[in-house]
Amino acid sequence: MTDQSHQCVIIGIAGASASGKSLIASTLYRELREQVGDEHIGVIPEDSYYKDQSHLSMEERVKTNYDHPNAMDHSLLFQHLQALKRGSAIELPVYSYVEHTRMQETVRVEPKKVIILEGILLLTDARLREEMNFSIFVDTPLDICLMRRIKRDVNERGRSMDSVMAQYQKTVRPMFLQFIEPSKQYADIIVPRGGKNRIAIDILKAKISQFFE
């Protein structure tokens, strides 16, 4: 864990796929932004750092285990976090869930006082944990996560229900048990019931607000 005197404060939010991480991150961002302004807080999704697969065929891309740490370019994410802490802007990769690879364009992200980082595998990497000022694990039952994942992937990512279920059984659940669940031990705060836990969100807001004082 890093010293809180750093210019850029990194807050990590991890948990299972469809556990409510993104909802918590977006709620914190939206409500804190109203207090401090866009220039002081930002969100970076770990999904942006899925490795480039443009050299692979679509058939090969869909076979990738996206719930394994090896699917992530954590080295690039680590470098970007260090750059933000030095006060340098980064070029955030853009990942397409439809094409299963990075796009050519990037999004410029300027340094902020607080960066909220959210993703399933954040706490599995010791380098990333060291860059976080504190970390959160969203602890939601897997059956609820599965229902949310089916709804999200079918409606928002152009997936079929059969493909979502097959991926869940083959990689999502096994990788959660092997990598994500054990990483909960590294979290400073564990949030049950996902993004609808208003009390937890208010506590997190109060904690994060201290960094703006």
Curated annotation (Swiss-Prot):
<dbReference type="InterPro" id="IPR027417">
    <property type="entry name" value="P-loop_NTPase"/>
</dbReference>
<feature type="binding site">
    <location>
        <begin position="15"/>
        <end position="22"/>
    </location>
    <ligand>
        <name>ATP</name>
    </ligand>
</feature>
<keyword id="KW-0418">Kinase</keyword>
<comment type="pathway">
    <text>Pyrimidine metabolism; UMP biosynthesis via salvage pathway; UMP from uridine: step 1/1.</text>
</comment>
<dbReference type="Pfam" id="PF00485">
    <property type="entry name" value="PRK"/>
</dbReference>
<dbReference type="GO" id="GO:0044206">
    <property type="term" value="P:UMP salvage"/>
</dbReference>
<dbReference type="GO" id="GO:0043771">
    <property type="term" value="F:cytidine kinase activity"/>
</dbReference>
<dbReference type="InterPro" id="IPR006083">
    <property type="entry name" value="PRK/URK"/>
</dbReference>
<protein>
    <recommendedName>
        <fullName>Uridine kinase</fullName>
        <ecNumber>2.7.1.48</ecNumber>
    </recommendedName>
</protein>
<comment type="similarity">
    <text>Belongs to the uridine kinase family.</text>
</comment>
<dbReference type="GO" id="GO:0004849">
    <property type="term" value="F:uridine kinase activity"/>
</dbReference>
<keyword id="KW-0963">Cytoplasm</keyword>
<comment type="pathway">
    <text>Pyrimidine metabolism; CTP biosynthesis via salvage pathway; CTP from cytidine: step 1/3.</text>
</comment>
<dbReference type="InterPro" id="IPR026008">
    <property type="entry name" value="Uridine_kinase"/>
</dbReference>
<keyword id="KW-0067">ATP-binding</keyword>
<dbReference type="InterPro" id="IPR000764">
    <property type="entry name" value="Uridine_kinase-like"/>
</dbReference>
<keyword id="KW-0547">Nucleotide-binding</keyword>
<dbReference type="GO" id="GO:0005737">
    <property type="term" value="C:cytoplasm"/>
</dbReference>
<dbReference type="GO" id="GO:0005524">
    <property type="term" value="F:ATP binding"/>
</dbReference>
<keyword id="KW-0808">Transferase</keyword>
<dbReference type="GO" id="GO:0044211">
    <property type="term" value="P:CTP salvage"/>
</dbReference>
